[in-house]
């Protein structure tokens, strides 16, 4: 334990070094060094040096204690035996366009409750990405084996220095209203998504393109047949970006045809009937109840789309969702009540699939919880609370789906961009907890937590927090039995040493808005990688990122 405590203290010293340039005293880490390091990673052309910089970035991130990994994701779903052809990938994307339902031309399903955004540039949720895939398209996509393949493009050419890509568009592409879809639509869409005034959460994903954010070096040919993209540095995951929904095309005429579109850029897709380009169009939307997607006859591969309709039940109540599935009202669901999982594991309709991501708890670094503390003391508080969480218990009693406990933010199995796996000990890098290949062990460590809290100025009577120095905060989560059960486990773990945690549950959209705005102390969170490179899970914490829910640098 002493060895691990020393490693944690060393992490806090690292945090102290990177925050030494702070202009004002306070508990928030200065994030200038982290932002600069991510920029260096994006510009680095030596793969080994790039990997080293990404490890350095994760070291800084984990030293704050603001990210508390709980477990590494996998995914579950239930599918009637009459359904075939649905596929998913490591990034949580689900593809329904080639599904079939025996004896029916309609697939009835549930993914989530009311979506936050249907504009692919503004979406930031996995469920929203699945809806975007059903109704829009990008230059590339994924096949059933998880491999990249051309979609609205037919291929590309890359310059010898890796800095220029020229994509050739598929001929005859149409929007759902019959208008031509060309490279000019992609030029417009990317520049819109990157522009500060659009305020897209994923705008930072365009920052490897020259001219980001306001003068993106993306140019369509005069005839709209090709799209040329100029990069600041070679990008090994360029084609992965081409398959990501933020890079999908949206119709300029529809986007800008809504009154007040400048102030509300996603308003054009807030009701059924908006123009799409993918296999389906949204034709009916009863908000907070249901959505109906109908086959798009103008989709370039419409002849291979066998379904006529997708009917979505909108709900986050997994008890109601499972009841609907049992009653035969839906054919596909991807959540079930926690207390049903063990009974379902031998059911042939129950499926587990791999994901590349991390379920975690995040702290708002601007919370009053850390008022009066130094940067190092605030980090010690957060790291201490992490050591009190029984991850194995959460997995065994709540997750129950063979998840693995997490002790680093970057998940197991993620590539390192240099021909290997990132989360491993090797000659180039060794994790602080070498034995467990992470930043700390998996076991609850009450003694270590108490030592860290004492470092942060808290007093103890034995193993209980003294009434002289109480800790009390609120935990934010959305309305889902699994997420609430995890919150209750953490609440119990912290209560064992006298820490008071109350739980606030909200519906999905309120939860997202409050977490994004920093209206919380501690919140449940999770990130499934958008592509297989650590930079995806590191650049989301830059000051400018729309996914920086922790409020680093703000």
Language-model features, listed with the residues they occupy:
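Surface-exposed binding/hinge segments that line
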Residues: 157, 187, 201-257
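Ligand-site clamp/hinge motif
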Residues: 271, 297-342, 500-502, 507
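Gly/Pro-rich hinge or "lid" segments in bacterial periplasmic/extracellular proteins
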Residues: 117, 123-126, 133, 141-147, ...
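Aromatic- and charge-enriched surface segment that lines or borders ligand/interaction sites
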Residues: 49, 154-202, 228-230, 321-324, ...
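N-terminal lobe/hinge region of extracytoplasmic solute-binding protein
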Residues: 69-71, 77-78, 91-92, 110-160, ...
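Long beta-strand-rich cores associated with HINT superfamily self-processing modules
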Residues: 77-106
């Amino acid at each position: 334990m002493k060895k691990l405590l020393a490693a944690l203290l060393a992490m806090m010293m690292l945090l102290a070094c990177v925050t030494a340039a702070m202009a004002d005293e306070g508990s928030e880490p200065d994030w200038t060094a982290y932002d600069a390091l991510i920029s260096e990673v994006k510009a680095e052309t030596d793969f080994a040096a790039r990997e080293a910089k990404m490890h350095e970035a994760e070291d800084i991130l984990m030293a704050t204690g603001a990210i508390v990994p709980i477990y590494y994701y996998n995914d579950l779903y239930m599918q009637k035996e009459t359904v075939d052809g649905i596929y998913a990938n490591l990034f949580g994307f689900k593809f329904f366009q080639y599904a079939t339902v025996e004896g029916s031309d309609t697939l009835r399903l549930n993914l989530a409750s009311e979506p936050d955004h249907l504009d692919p540039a503004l979406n930031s949720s996995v469920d929203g990405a699945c809806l975007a895939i059903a109704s829009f398209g990008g230059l590339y996509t994924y096949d059933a084996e998880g491999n990249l393949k051309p979609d609205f493009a037919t291929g590309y050419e890359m310059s010898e220095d890796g800095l220029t890509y020229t994509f050739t568009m598929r001929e005859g592409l149409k929007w759902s209203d019959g208008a031509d879809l060309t490279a000019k639509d992609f030029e417009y869409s990317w520049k819109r998504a990157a522009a500060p005034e659009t305020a897209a959460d994923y705008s930072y994903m365009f920052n490897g393109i020259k001219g980001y954010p306001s003068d993106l070096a993306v140019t369509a040919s005069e005839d709209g047949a090709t799209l040329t993209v100029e990069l600041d540095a070679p990008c090994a995951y360029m084609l992965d970006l081409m398959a990501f929904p933020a890079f999908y095309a949206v119709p300029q005429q529809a986007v800008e045809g809504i009154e007040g579109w400048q102030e509300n850029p996603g308003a054009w897709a807030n009701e059924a009937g908006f123009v799409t380009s993918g296999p389906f169009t949204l034709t009916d939307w009863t908000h907070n109840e249901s959505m109906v997607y109908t086959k798009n006859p103008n989709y370039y591969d419409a002849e291979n789309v066998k379904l006529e309709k997708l009917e979505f039940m909108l709900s986050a109540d997994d008890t109601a969702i499972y009841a609907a599935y049992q009653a035969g009202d839906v054919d596909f669901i991807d959540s079930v009540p926690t207390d049903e999982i063990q009974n379902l594991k031998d059911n042939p309709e129950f499926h587990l699939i791999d994901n590349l991501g991390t379920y975690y708890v995040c702290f708002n670094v601007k919370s009053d919880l850390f008022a009066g503390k130094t940067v190092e003391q605030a980090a010690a508080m957060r790291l201490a609370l992490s050591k009190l969480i029984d991850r194995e218990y959460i997995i065994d009693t709540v997750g129950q789906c063979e998840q693995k406990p997490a002790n680093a933010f970057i998940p197991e199995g993620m590539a390192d961009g240099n021909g290997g796996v990132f989360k491993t000990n090797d000659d180039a890098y060794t994790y602080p907890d070498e034995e467990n290949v992470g930043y700390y062990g998996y076991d609850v460590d009450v003694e270590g937590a108490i030592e860290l809290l004492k470092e942060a100025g808290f007093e103890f009577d034995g193993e209980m927090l003294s009434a002289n120095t109480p800790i009390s905060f609120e935990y934010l989560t959305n309305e889902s039995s699994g997420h609430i059960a995890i919150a209750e486990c953490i609440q119990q773990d912290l209560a064992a040493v006298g820490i008071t945690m109350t739980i606030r549950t909200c519906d999905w959209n309120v939860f997202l808005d409050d977490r994004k705005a920093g209206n919380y102390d501690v919140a449940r969170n999770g990130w499934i990688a958008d592509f297989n490179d650590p930079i995806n899970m590191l650049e989301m914490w830059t000051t400018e990122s729309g996914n920086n829910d922790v409020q680093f640098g703000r």
